[in-house]
Amino acid sequence: LQHLLIGEVWLCAGQSNMVMPLNGFDYCPISDSNNVIADAPNHPGIRMVTIKPTVKLSPQEYAEGSWQQPTTENAPKFSAAAYHYALTLQRTLQIPIGVITCAWGGSRVEGWLPKEILQTYKDEDLTLIGSDKTPVYLQSMLMYNGILYPCHKYTIKGFIWYQGESNVRSSRTYAERLATMVKHWRSIWEQ
């Protein structure tokens, strides 16, 4: 083992704005990103891992992703929101910060909840999960099983969630489901 640090680990999850890398998307640049990327090696107290977007029908024990110390080569691929969050925490707290990014563009909050909770929602058609009738990013529970649940063994200080636009058509239920998601996530991380 090399380059180990003792500090705090945070989880950053959400949709496309959490996915957006430091170098931006095509035709969607990020202001001052070149300077932030050039400065990345000056932050040895930060570690980042992006969990590979994976959908699964059952909760997985392991996910794909490796911890990285920021360099000018790898920083452009880091989630911009997650990296800026890590920078702010590290500068403020003056301790090492690790960030786990679990994100999928366009996903709904239901994609980040387990089957046991989804079964209580009368408006959720769980028969569509795993089918080609609905785009994967809109399906319930798949991100939870393939991306989020495998990270529950990490000890984390907390988490941030960025977005909710894919739930715009279900705005009446979003607030309650977001609160349920937060409560469930806190329970699996024993917070």
PLM regions and their residue ranges:
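Cell-envelope and extracellular/periplasmic
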Residues: 1-191
